[in-house]
Amino acid sequence: MHLLLVQLLVLLPLGKADLCVDGCQSQGSLSFPLLERGRRDLHVANHEEAEDKPDLFVAVPHLMGTSLAGEGQRQRGKMLSRLGRFWKKPETEFYPPRDVESDHVSSGMQAVTQPADGRKVERSPLQEEAKRFWHRFMFRKGPAFQGVILPIKSHEVHWETCRTVPFNQTIAHEDCQKVVVQNNLCFGKCSSIRFPGEGADAHSFCSHCSPTKFTTVHLMLNCTSPTPVVKMVMQVEECQCMVKTERGEERLLLAGSQGSFIPGLPASKTNP
C-alpha cells in the first residue's frame, strides 16, 4: 500500500510536465503564426499610413503652394520641438537665422578671403582711399580711370612718406591710337611750416612730393590725320619732398615728408 502511494506521487509530476510540454508546444505553434500575421498587418498599416502622410523633412517647392509650405513648416517646427535639442542643433546649423546669414554675406563682401594658413590678408580700404586720391589729384577726366588700383600701403597714407608708385599711363588723342606707357607717379604727404612774423617777415613753406629725377620723352602717335601728333611725356624715376615758399622758390627738403605730383604736366625745371 505504501509502495503504491509512492509510485503515484512520483508519476503525478511527470504527467503534469508532459501535459505542459504538449500544451506549450501547441500554444507556441499557434502564437508564432499569430505573431507573423500581426507583423505583416502592422507593416501594411504603417506603409499605408506612410503613403497617406507626407514626409515632413522633404520639401518640393515647385509642387506645393505657399499655404502648404507654411503648413509644412509649422508641422516641422512642432515635430522638432517635440524631439528636443537633439534635432534643434542640426536645424540651427543648416538653417541659420537671417541676421546671421546677412552678416556673413556682408562681411564676405567687404573682407578679402583669408589664406589657408591663417595669416591675415591686408584689406583694401586704403587702396580705395588711394584710388580716390588718384581721381582727385591725378586725372579728373571722368570715369575712365575708376578701375585703377594703386599699390599703396596703408601706413603710408597716415605717415609722412614720399615715393614712386608704378602705373600704366595711357596717352590718347583724337583720331589716334592709344599708347600705354610704363611710368611712375609721386605719392606721399609732406610737411608744411610757417614762421611767425609781421607782414613780409612771415614765411610759409609747403613741401610737395615732387619728382627729383625724370626724363622727358617725345612720343609720336599713330593717327589718321595727315598732321603728325607728338606728345611729351614725363617719365619719373625718383621722388622727394620739395619745399615751395610763398615767393615761388622751390628747393629740396632733406628732412621732410610727402605730397602729390601729376605726371604729364609741364615742369618748370628739369632736375637730372
Swiss-Prot record:
Family named by the database record: Belongs to the DAN family.
Matching InterPro entries: Cerberus (IPR016860), Cys_knot_C (IPR006207), Cystine-knot_cytokine (IPR029034), DAN (IPR004133)
Iron keyword on record: no
Organism this protein belongs to: Mus musculus (Mouse)
Underlying gene: Cer1
Protein name: Cerberus
Disulphide connectivity of cysteines: C162-C209, C176-C223, C186-C239, C190-C241
PANTHER family in UniProt: CERBERUS, DAN DOMAIN FAMILY MEMBER 5
Summary of the function given for this chain in its UniProt record: Cytokine that may play a role in anterior neural induction and somite formation during embryogenesis in part, through a BMP-inhibitory mechanism. Can regulate Nodal signaling during gastrulation as well as the formation and patterning of the primitive streak.
Subunit note: Forms monomers and predominantly dimers.
One Gene Ontology biological process: cell population proliferation
Localization in the cell: Secreted
The organism's taxonomic lineage, starting at the top: Eukaryota, Metazoa, Chordata, Craniata, Vertebrata
Extent of the signal sequence: 1-17
Chain ranges of the CTCK domain: 162-246
Keyword presence, Secreted: yes
Gene Ontology MF: a single term: protein homodimerization activity
Keyword entries, A-Z: Cytokine, Disulfide bond, Glycoprotein, Secreted, Signal
Protein modification: N-glycosylated.
Pfam families on file: DAN
Major localization listed first in the record, in broad terms: secreted
Entry GO CC: extracellular region; extracellular space
Domain of life: Eukaryota
Glycosylation site list: N168, N222
